[in-house]
Amino acid sequence: MDGNAAPLDEICKLAEKYDALVMVDECHSAGVLGKTGRGITELYNLRGQVDILTGTLGKAFGGAVGGFTTGRKEIIDMLRQRSRPYLFSNSLPPAVVGAGIETFKMLAESHELHDRLVANVEHFRAGMMAAGFDIKPTQSAICAVMLYDAKLSQDFAARLQDEGIFVTGFYYPVVPKGQARIRVQVSAGHTTEQLDRCIAAFVKIGKEMNVIK
């Protein structure tokens, strides 16, 4: 929920010690974390040392439906026979699969989108913090604007929509009590002008609602 990364290096050491397998869900990290956006395994220099990786095509890889699981051949062969979600689901549309493959190729051939995403996240965070908002530390594209009050987060999100900014307020039970926030997903597709417009809307409403001075 906060965009922070698990201590995967320590987890892998424990798995090796106790002869366990490691499965990592890269839904929020693939295309984002690591020097070239290859995910949390690249961030910790653990590529090839994780047994099972799962991910989604619904976030960095184009915003489509569906997802994927990858790993050693013997593991994937077993999952094809034993994984109930796989066995009892329909296949993805060919157009979705084709678009996903092309997105993988784009990210493998160029780091431009990843670098732009990193720059956009830094720009948004810096602008929001300079305005006086409480922003949780993050290693991803998720920027949590902390408001702490459930109703405030809902009202704030509604006012942002009035300003043409679509965000979602999160509150208990999605997050712990007293930890309500607005979660902003920054994209490589955002322009600097769009990010500045978003920051300006936050500042305007933040002052209206006495969140910032």
Question: Where is each model-derived feature located?
Answer:
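Active-site PLP attachment segment
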Residues: T36, E42-M78
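Short, small-residue-enriched loops and turns at beta-alpha junctions
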Residues: M1-D2, S29-L33, Y86-L87, A144, ...
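PLP-dependent aminotransferase class I/II
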Residues: F61-M128, F133-K136
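Conserved PLP-binding catalytic core of the aspartate aminotransferase-like
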Residues: S110, D115-F124, M129-G164, V174, ...
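PLP-dependent enzyme catalytic core of the Aspartate aminotransferase-like
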Residues: D162-I165, V174-K213
